[in-house]
């Protein structure tokens, strides 16, 4: 599978969707905000026609594990520039293990390639694997500098796992906006930052995500496909960023962020499902 190339569209050149088209989506999001006493941000970018819609798209939300796509994109970029060898290995030490490392915790005393570390963190959200990648790409600062280089002036990474998931209200560290992350994903997967081979690798890691089956994938329209990366953190943070495309190659970029809620994980997951279903309805109803 190969993504539609999106005509090199970036957020500054998009056309804002009519309010009526996403009226039901907005109503659904607002209702969920009230029911969960949450703060929610959503963005949708149609890469076929540049149409864009958001709800609280410029508000900041905790990145949580959605940063992992950017960190691994930075690794791919650095490899293309000859700055790092993705096949180089790192010894796994017990002292380096952090919370939630389902792959790496079984490999203490062994070595792992950077490429395999990206596969682990992108498909299982392994946090120690993410820290291994961060160490290889210049740490949080290296990721933030990379973001600025490709035109993202909002998204920032300041800490490593697991501290970056703290999620305090008003803390600018380790945050993004729904609008900024959509633009960045568009650039990384469809722009000129990465080679086609690197884009395909990044895409495959997202397609093979093993931890999002109960989120957008559970309400994906028939004959549609998805590549995604989710996250969760303190103070009710829950998030997902996704590239979704139809059999006709119609491709949309979706970002959903929740924060500042006491809702359970199950309730937050259900919120993402409901928002996703509402968004998908906009596009499937057009083809009926």
Curated annotation (Swiss-Prot):
Catalytic residues of the enzyme: 65
Q: Which residues bind substrate?
A: 229-231
Specify the enzyme's EC class, one word: hydrolase
Q: Which InterPro entries match?
A: Beta-lactam/transpept-like (IPR012338), Beta-lactam_cat (IPR045155), Beta-lactam_class-A (IPR000871), Beta-lactam_class-A_AS (IPR023650)
Activity regulation, free text: Inhibited by clavulanic acid, sulbactam and tazobactam.
Give an example GO molecular function.
beta-lactamase activity
What's a GO biological-process term for it? Answer: response to antibiotic
Q: What is its EC number?
A: 3.5.2.6
Q: Where is the signal peptide?
A: 1-17
Q: Which Pfam families match?
A: Beta-lactamase2
The disulfide bonds in this chain are 72-118
Q: Per the similarity annotation, which family is this?
A: Belongs to the class-A beta-lactamase family.
The family database entries (NCBIfam families) matched by this protein are listed as:
bla_class_A, carbeni_gen, PSE
Extra facts: The class A beta-lactamase family has a specific amino-acid numbering system, sometimes called Ambler or ABL numbering and often misspelt as Amber. A multiple sequence alignment was used to derive a consensus sequence and then the consensus was numbered taking into account insertions and deletions. This allows use of identical numbers, e.g. for active site residues, despite differences in protein length. UniProt always uses natural numbering of residues, hence there appear to be differences in numbering between this entry and some papers.
| Name of the protein in question | Beta-lactamase CARB-6
The encoding gene is carB6
């Amino acid at each position: 599978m190969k993504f539609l190339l999106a005509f090199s569209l970036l957020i500054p050149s998009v056309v804002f969707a009519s309010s009526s088209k996403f009226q039901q989506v907005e109503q659904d999001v607002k209702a969920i905000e009230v029911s969960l006493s949450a703060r929610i941000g959503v963005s949708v970018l149609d890469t076929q026609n540049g149409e864009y819609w958001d709800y609280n798209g410029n508000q900041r939300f905790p990145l949580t594990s959605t940063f992992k796509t950017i960190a691994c994109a930075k690794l791919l970029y650095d490899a293309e520039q000859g700055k790092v060898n993705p096949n180089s290995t790192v010894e796994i030490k017990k002292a380096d293990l952090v919370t939630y490392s389902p792959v790496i915790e079984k490999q203490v005393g062994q070595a792992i390639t950077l490429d395999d570390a990206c596969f682990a963190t992108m498909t299982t959200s392994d946090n120690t694997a993410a820290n291994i990648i961060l160490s290889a790409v210049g740490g949080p600062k290296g990721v933030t500098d990379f973001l600025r280089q490709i035109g993202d002036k909002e998204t920032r990474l300041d800490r490593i796992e697991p501290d970056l998931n703290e999620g305090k209200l008003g803390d600018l560290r380790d945050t993004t906006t729904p609008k900024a992350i959509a633009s960045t994903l568009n650039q990384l997967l469809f722009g000129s930052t990465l080679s086609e081979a690197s884009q395909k690798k990044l895409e495959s890691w997202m397609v093979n995500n093993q931890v999002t089956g109960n989120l957008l994938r559970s309400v994906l329209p028939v004959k549609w496909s998805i590549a995604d990366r989710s996250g969760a953190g303190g103070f009710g943070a829950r998030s997902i960023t996704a590239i979704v495309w139809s059999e006709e190659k119609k491709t949309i970029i979706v970002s959903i962020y929740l924060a500042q809620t006491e809702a359970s994980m199950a309730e937050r997951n259900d919120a993402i499902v409901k928002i996703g279903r509402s968004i998908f309805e906009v596009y499937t109803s057009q083809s009926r």
